[in-house]
Amino acid sequence: MTETTALASSTASSQPSSQASSQVLSLDLIITCADGLEAPLQTELTSFGIASEIKSTGRLAVTGTLRDLYKICLWSRVASRVLMLIKRKNINAEYDVAEQLYGLAKSVNWTEQFSLEQTFAIRLSVDKRVAVSQQFAMLRIKDAIADTFNEVYESRPNVDSKNPDFSVFATVNDKQAELYLDLSGTSLHRRGYRVAMTEAPLKENLAAALLYSAGWHKKNEAGDTPFYNALIDPMCGSGTFIIEALLMHCDYAVGIDKAANQFGFYEWQHHDAALWQEMIDDAQTRFRAALEIANEQPDTLPLIFGFDADNGAIIATEKNLIAAGLQDLLPLLDIETRALDQLSTLLKPLVADGRLSNPLIITNPPYGERLGDEEMIKPLYQSIGLILQDSFAGSGIDPMLGILASHVEQVDILPIREPKTLRCHNGAITVYFRYGTLIAGQTGNLVSRFEKREIEVEDGQDFINRLQKNLTRLKKLAKKDNVSNIRVYNADLPDFKVAIDLYGDYAHVQEYAPPKTIPPETAKKRFNLALMGIREVFGINREQIFIKTRARQSGNDQYSKQGNTEKRGKFYIAREDGAYLYVNFTDYLDTGLFIDHRNMRARIKDNSRNKSVLNLFAYTCTASVHAALAGAKKVTSVDLSQNYLDWGKQNFALNGLNVSSNKYQFVAADIFEWIKDNTEQFDIIFIDPPTFSNSKKFQGTFDVQRDHAALINRAMNRLTADGILYFSNNFTRFELDEQLTERYDIIDITQKTIGFDFDIKKPIHQSFEIRHRQSL
């Protein structure tokens, strides 16, 4: 059988000089790393001037000197362990494998590796194709080492399985067995700076590997300044990305903290203490010099931004920065409590004045295990992309974006150009790192891009002319108010009874059921002409048009799922006044966003800062989102439907709002019962009830004309003395109860809440501002 002995012999007691030792010993090393990090580790080793070969998952082979060994242990940010090959031997798996391992271990002179006074432990990895008791095989390797020492000293070193001075690693497959000595000691990922923790932290060497993958280590073409001028982590947790990025920039040897007593080679017979101390001194000098330059010339330090919605995470980050020896840089960093929804407000001025000319945005969002609610993960990742696109819109800057996720589908929705994906592990969790340049956000929408032109369509010319006339007028108003979701046609012509609403780049077309006097084939022909006209006027394809037939509603039809529809179950994103909102064009009669209440939501937003807000009949919580984005101190959304509240939660997450925060409550309950039993007071209350409801979830029915007075009276009991209640409804024949006007100060604000795209002479809704009557 073939045997290979990897370590050249050397006289241990002589402690050779630094130069001699590095020349005498030729070491066959295996550098281990977490699965998936082989390429970043190889990049790092190459930067050290050390050639390597990827042998298998998580293992790189290096043939090097003692200096190379020390350099990897001292400087590698990605490696997990450094194993030195002691001996390798071919085996026959059909024979007694445990005894073959004994023979292999017995052929090694262990007294040349460590002394009698030191403890050791055995670690064994066995291929599943090999039939052997792992425990017994480890025992036989231990026996071989003990027998070797007994033959020389008539005594043997002790075994310490928990905290040994040396760990002997053995690997066995169906053809070969190998013995290694662990010279790194404790895992190299431990830096020593993690004194404060947050939930599910990122391992240090994984963070470093991802920074390598994203190119943080690169310099500009001249080689004298960093390639990136800023690093932004919008959900920094305990600050691992920030700290690892700073340690890279400041030329910090991450093994310095372990240099006191934690390396496995300290008691090794071939350890060269003089060479090691020389390398430690050099590393410390380099770090001090880099810190001095950063403090004296702050412009040489990239801008560093670390944000988290959890103040505890920010405190942890600052503590860890100090523990990492970076306390002198704290005044130069922007580490603050800031929720994701506030990110764009900070970034836009920095982009505008050129301070973010080439940033790296890298983060580890609270995916899966950290977030806890799977339904919130997709909106969270979408919100990151949307907020960043908004922040860099029109700047000409293409930032690098790198984001971790627990499932690759989560990062598939990120707007990244030519994305790369790294599959790796954060501890036991498989994660995916998606990185690449951010795709610039689309500018404009169907309204803003509309240009009037000559279009000739037989039998449909009147419709096209009216639609273009409407759009010519609406385009100017939409641009003035920055509106992209509007109604552009509402049965203006008797022969074309449709309503056309635009949501960004999509057309939502509702066909009113024709009267019985119109033959079905005539109605169908006219509707098809309208669809053709819509495509011609907007220059859009069939996939951008969604069709519904609208008949007289009864009960809860407005909120019920539709039957024979196309493209079911897909949500699209509409933007309104700085908010992102999910809309569904197929599954329900309504889309999830009532565009006729656009001005009402703006009014609520303008009055919500530092206020407590209650949204009754909250539906998909669009008004609640606006209140939260405006800085409301608390927002409570109440609706009978849990499904719509879940939709509302996703709207919150889509805007970077933390639905787990105590600031935001989502309550599935009967409105009348809830406001009767709840005693909390609110500064702003919004009520937009259905015209009629007969839901099975509560007894009886709700009729807005019949029941609005009782509803408002109960709600006013929950309104603070100087608060405002906004009441709105879409019942065309609605009349406000006179007793309410006698009891409260009420202002009809319908004219102010009807948008420019709706007919004020035939208001689609009525709205009122209601306050407590003040005593004189």
Swiss-Prot record:
Keywords noted in UniProt: Cytoplasm, Methyltransferase, RNA-binding, rRNA processing, S-adenosyl-L-methionine, Transferase
Reactions mediated catalytically: guanosine(2445) in 23S rRNA + S-adenosyl-L-methionine = N(2)-methylguanosine(2445) in 23S rRNA + S-adenosyl-L-homocysteine + H(+); guanosine(2069) in 23S rRNA + S-adenosyl-L-methionine = N(2)-methylguanosine(2069) in 23S rRNA + S-adenosyl-L-homocysteine + H(+)
EC number: 2.1.1.173, 2.1.1.264
Record-annotated THUMP domain positions: 68-183
One GO CC term, this protein: cytoplasm
Keyword Zinc: no
Matching Pfam families: Methyltrans_SAM, RlmL_1st, THUMP, UPF0020
Record-linked InterPro entries: 23SrRNA_methyltr_KL, DNA_methylase_N6_adenine_CS, RlmKL-like_Mtase, RlmKL-like_Mtase_CS, RlmL_1st, SAM-dep_methyl-trfase, SAM-dependent_MTases_sf, THUMP_dom
Similarity annotation: Belongs to the methyltransferase superfamily. RlmKL family.
Function: Specifically methylates the guanine in position 2445 (m2G2445) and the guanine in position 2069 (m7G2069) of 23S rRNA.
Protein name: Ribosomal RNA large subunit methyltransferase K/L
Organism: Psychrobacter cryohalolentis (strain ATCC BAA-1226 / DSM 17306 / VKM B-2378 / K5)
Lineage of producing organism: Bacteria, Pseudomonadati, Pseudomonadota, Gammaproteobacteria, Moraxellales
